[in-house]
């Protein structure tokens, strides 16, 4: 029996649309992510458990974990009969890499169970492919940090899919999920087909400056450069109360604030625990819309997906 935990992730980070992502873990020890268990069996079966299991497709073939099993078996050239259990602790359509959690946990669990026949690069490529089935296009900005941990920059050249970018230990990520769903496909459809030259230049400057600031250990400069001219100006209309929440977070001392992934989760970056707590309390009172919403104060999850049983 193998049990794997895969952590939540925040893609884009305002400054790196489709090319940056960070794995996150709550400072209070709460597990924010999915678990997948694999056990030997005579034939394949899949059981869904966890807080958000009711949101999953009822037909096993439509479940991404089943599709991961099928693709993994095809990849290694043999059918491996197993009993799989998905603990779905992540809300779907939250902007926290929910589908990536399930994909990464399922594939890592299968790879561990079978004695690691696939290497890291092949695993990551397969993860991107599976993620693409849900979002409509292959992208790695959730699966790469979820699998490998830390902040990841998508390279996709010379056989390298992604590489780690050094983060800052003092950064606290306040993540507020309001409890509503935003589909990745819908959030992509709202974006323009073409961008103005000055927006392209600003985007390049922000992203290059951010990566430079990370490597030269300038946390305040890095945070200052976390600006989004590509997606946020268009996606805010899908997120009730986002503009007010961002303004409030910045006034309370957040270093940066933006949309996590395609939303509706908001992230606010703080460098002091008391600031993070103030921002978290405000968001809990004003940004959440129902009982399914939550706020977590997180740090970077540097471990990524891991065997927990």
Curated annotation (Swiss-Prot):
Assigned GO CC terms: cytoplasm
Protein location: Cytoplasm
GO biological process terms held by the UniProt record: threonine biosynthetic process
Family annotation (InterPro entries): GHMP_kinase_C_dom, GHMP_kinase_C_sf, GHMP_kinase_N_dom, GHMP_knse_ATP-bd_CS, Homoserine_kinase, Ribosomal_Su5_D2-typ_SF, Ribsml_uS5_D2-typ_fold_subgr
Residues annotated for ATP binding in this entry: 91-101
Keywords: Amino-acid biosynthesis, ATP-binding, Cytoplasm, Kinase, Nucleotide-binding, Threonine biosynthesis, Transferase
Pathway(s) of this molecule: Amino-acid biosynthesis; L-threonine biosynthesis; L-threonine from L-aspartate: step 4/5
Entry EC no(s): 2.7.1.39
Gene3D superfamilies membership: 3.30.230.10, GHMP kinase, C-terminal domain
Subcellular location, principal: cytoplasm
Catalysed reaction equations from the record: L-homoserine + ATP = O-phospho-L-homoserine + ADP + H(+)
Keyword Nucleotide-binding assigned: yes
Keyword Zinc-finger assigned: no
Similarity-based family: Belongs to the GHMP kinase family. Homoserine kinase subfamily.
Record function comment: Catalyzes the ATP-dependent phosphorylation of L-homoserine to L-homoserine phosphate.
Protein name, UniProt field: Homoserine kinase
Protein species of origin: Klebsiella pneumoniae subsp. pneumoniae (strain ATCC 700721 / MGH 78578)
